[in-house]
Regions:
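Active-site-adjacent structural elements that line small-molecule/cofactor binding pockets in enzymes
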Residues: 1-173
Length: 173
């Protein structure tokens, strides 16, 4: 190859690199480069399709481009979601209103019409039902929870624990 390797050498480093793709086009580029795909809570595209549909397309295009590139390993795909299980009164106070009629949103970022994914906030059984319908979430290998750091470490740990205890097992994770 003629390439210099990174020192100190870390075997398998190339398989631990992720690219945060904000569009279907950059997801294809990531596949061609041979890096894992990280898809966030927004895409710099707005076609009229739902965020989950756009993101599912992004994942499918990534996997197709990966196959065409002929890489000799299977990449990982992560999606980010704002998910808040409501398990007590404090959760309801912080997030209860967000879950009522929450939808994707369209906005403009750096001149691009963009689609933003909705915030999931509901009691665990409702979350499981909603998340099972999120095609991109079901297509991914990993989910990253985006939570508001301004609520403090203890409350953020509560959110993560509520998700891990009440939601993830029902999704088969």
């Amino acid at each position: 190859h003629g390439r210099l390797r990174i020192e100190p050498h870390s075997p398998g480093l190339d398989r631990r690199i992720w690219w945060g793709a904000g569009s279907r086009e950059t997801a294809v580029w990531a596949a061609q480069q041979g890096v894992n795909l990280m898809s966030s809570t927004l895409l710099t595209e707005a076609t009229g399709d739902s965020f989950a549909q756009l993101q599912s397309e992004q994942i499918a295009l990534f996997r197709d481009a990966w196959k065409k590139a002929g890489h000799d390993w299977t990449p990982r795909v992560s999606v980010s979601r704002s998910i808040f299980p409501i398990v007590n009164e404090l959760d309801a106070m912080y997030f209860g209103a967000r879950g009522q009629g929450a939808n994707d949103q369209i906005g403009v970022i750096d001149g691009f019409r963009s689609t933003f994914g909705k915030t999931y906030a509901a009691e665990p059984d409702q979350l499981v039902e909603q998340l099972n319908q999120d095609t991109a979430l079901m297509d991914a290998n990993s989910v990253m929870l985006t939570i508001p750091s301004q609520l403090g470490v203890d409350y953020n740990l509560h959110i993560l624990e509520a998700f891990a205890t009440h939601v993830a097992p029902e999704l088969g994770w």
